[in-house]
């Protein structure tokens, strides 16, 4: 990712382009390395006043005092995470259908990430979510819904005007030469 550029520079440039939330997802590094990486990313986010979310790991979320944690369907149950984190942290949840979305909202999730909307290179096992199903999820809950999965400049306009709070993109930003410009272009075609 980042086309050979420095990871932290990519994050900073993406924020300058308009990113409002950064989520750090690491599956294959040690806890110590994750912690150290998260500290650096948190510092960047803090400097720019954007939210910082950790994927899956409540321990890292608490240790670096991130703004929140994002939980998938096979991660810590939302209610247990809320019991541990109290109201000090945001909790996001992945939902691929109306039932999961309503359950996440009921259990105390602050937002929902829903997808994969398009094919994605960052998650091998991601099942595609149809646009009509995404619209139904958006309309079934009162909490914000963000679309995830394979979103880039070529398909972002398909997500306009369906009630999403925002979108999540990894490769649509980091695979581009200019992360700042990639974000600006995606947002221009979404808003």
Regions found by a protein language model. Give the residues of each.
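Short hydrophobic "strand-cap" motifs at the C-terminus of beta-strands
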Residues: 148, 170
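Short acidic/polar capping segments at secondary-structure boundaries
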Residues: 117-118, 151-153
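Short, glycine/charged-rich "phosphate-handling" switch motifs in NTP-dependent
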Residues: 165
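Phosphate-binding beta-alpha-beta segment of Rossmann-like dinucleotide-binding domains, i.e.
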Residues: 114, 119-127
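Conserved N-terminal beta1-alpha1 strand-loop-helix module at the mouth
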Residues: 1-78, 82-111, 126-129, 136, ...
